[in-house]
Amino acid sequence: MKYQAKYIRMSPTKVRRVVRLLDGMTYEKASQVVRFLPYRAATCVAKLLKSVNAQATQRVHFYVDQAPTLKRIRARAQSRAYPIKKRCCHITLEI
């Protein structure tokens, strides 16, 4: 079974930092560990785990993919503009 959280406004690399710690754990262990992680991405992963709890009896496996990037512009000196990429990600949970 696959569960997804899509278009999360966080960089995929920052979310992968949390997901690597939890990959392969049982549901109970992963939900306990994610509560005490000091990263902002842990809240998104915890929400995804919470929505799956009825079906989760085995090990959980996570995947993080890049979603479409929001492109913004930062105004700079002398009428120049620098691009800013606000990255998003999709988190997939497999049981």
Curated annotation (Swiss-Prot):
Keywords noted in UniProt: Chloroplast, Plastid, Ribonucleoprotein, Ribosomal protein, RNA-binding, rRNA-binding
Name the major location. plastid
- Note the SS bond partners: none
A GO biological process of this protein is: translation
Alphabetical GO CC annotations of the entry are: chloroplast; large ribosomal subunit
User: Where does the source fall among the domains of life?
Assistant: Eukaryota
Which molecular function terms from Gene Ontology are attached? rRNA binding; structural constituent of ribosome
Places the protein is found: Plastid, Chloroplast
Q: Which residues form the signal peptide?
A: none
The record's annotation in Pfam families points to: Ribosomal_L22
InterPro entries recorded for this chain?
A: Ribosomal_uL22 (IPR001063), Ribosomal_uL22_bac/org-type (IPR047867), Ribosomal_uL22_sf (IPR036394)
Q: Keyword Ribonucleoprotein, does the record have it?
A: yes
Tell me the subunit arrangement. Answer: Part of the 50S ribosomal subunit.
State the similarity comment.
Belongs to the universal ribosomal protein uL22 family.
- Report the protein's function: This protein binds specifically to 23S rRNA.
User: Could you identify this protein by its name?
Assistant: Large ribosomal subunit protein uL22c
Origin species, per record, is Cyanidioschyzon merolae (strain NIES-3377 / 10D) (Unicellular red alga)
Q: What is the lineage of its organism?
A: Eukaryota, Rhodophyta, Bangiophyceae, Cyanidiales, Cyanidiaceae
**Name of the gene encoding the protein in the UniProt record:** rpl22
